[in-house]
Amino acid sequence: MSTGLRYKSKLATPEDKQDIDKQYVGFATLPNQVHRKSVKKGFDFTLMVAGESGLGKSTLVHSLFLTDLYKDRKLLSAEERINQTVEILKHTVDIEEKGVKLKLTIVDTPGFGDAVNNSECWKPITDYVDQQFEQYFRDESGLNRKNIQDNRVHCCLYFISPFGHGLRPVDVGFMKALHEKVNIVPLIAKADCLVPSEIRKLKDRIREEIDKFGIHVYQFPECDSDEDEDFKQQDRELKESAPFAVIGSNTVVEAKGQRVRGRLYPWGIVEVENQAHCDFVKLRNMLIRTHMHDLKDVTCDVHYENYRAHCIQQMTSKLTQDSRMESPIPILPLPTPDAETEKLIRMKDEELRRMQEMLQKMKQQMQDQ
């Protein structure tokens, strides 16, 4: 039964204040405690960018976070790009804004989609995502779990060329290979190459093909009923705008007496942050201001849990098949374990046996979702 406090207009006496203090437990300060602890610890976010060369990936990242991560980048010739294999490059930078610290990691994929034969060109990328899951699983299962570093990919911005008539086979192959492992946010790159009617047609075509090929891109969560109308309107606009048509620019130009980031053409100026020109502001708001935490939650609660359940299932199946095995066989090929690793595996063996009993319950929960 809740107790309501009625405040009168007269000045409160010391006795009244004592009565109020007696009825105040103090757990209402929990959000403040969590906020202070989170700000002190800082936040981390790993963003992958993928797509063929020349679509403005690095420029868009610079525009989003106002940080140049590609100072030492070497530009390759067309011939070098054709012969280049897919690489995985990480760029990490610490950003601070109003006392809030963010450790941002950008995972770049140079060489993707540039070869003459692009079959299975996404394999190094899927392997990288799996390796981060595996490393986190090992750290989480270890004895020292205080300072686990989260390198899991929380979001993948996939750049689609504006010059085609929809998704290319390599686009479909990439997204289908990763859609169960990472949150994919498709983008139409270099939207200033298209007029508004062409952008609308291309968006409709991409949405149709995403449904046709059964690709699971990141789904915006539904708004709570108690959210204010402005937030609900913003959420509707985000959902209607996907896939986002974006423009990036590191150049400051003058438009109507104001200095803005944009591109200068003979016919006028395209402003990066003008919502009438592109969806850059919507993407930035979604990625940083409204949905960054949800992207991390979906990574942890859905994609990583699927990987973890698969690992546990394989381990317990192996234990069931051969009870004489001293330790479960890891999922991915590993170097020969040392004495400390063997000891750790033996200690975890009993825990894995208990987890086998929980496996059926976990499967049922996943099916219910």
From Swiss-Prot:
UniProt region (G3 motif), positions on chain: 108-111
Chain positions found as Phosphothreonine: 13, 336
UniProt cross-references to PROSITE patterns, sorted A to Z: G_SEPTIN
Gene Ontology CC terms, in alphabetical order: axon terminus; calyx of Held; cell cortex; plasma membrane; presynapse; septin complex; synapse; synaptic vesicle
Encoding gene (name): Septin5
Location of the region described as G4 motif in the Swiss-Prot/TrEMBL record: 189-192
Chain residues that bind GTP: 51-58, 85, 111, 190-198, 248, 263
Subcellular location: Cytoplasm; Cytoplasm, Cytoskeleton
Effects seen without this gene: Mice have a normal life-span and show no apparent abnormalities, including synaptic properties and hippocampal neuron growth. In platelets, hyperresponsive degranulation phenotype.
Residue ranges constituting the Septin-type G domain according to the UniProt record: 41-314
PTM-bearing positions, type Omega-N-methylarginine: 168
Function: Filament-forming cytoskeletal GTPase. Involved in cytokinesis (Potential). May play a role in platelet secretion.
Protein name: Septin-5
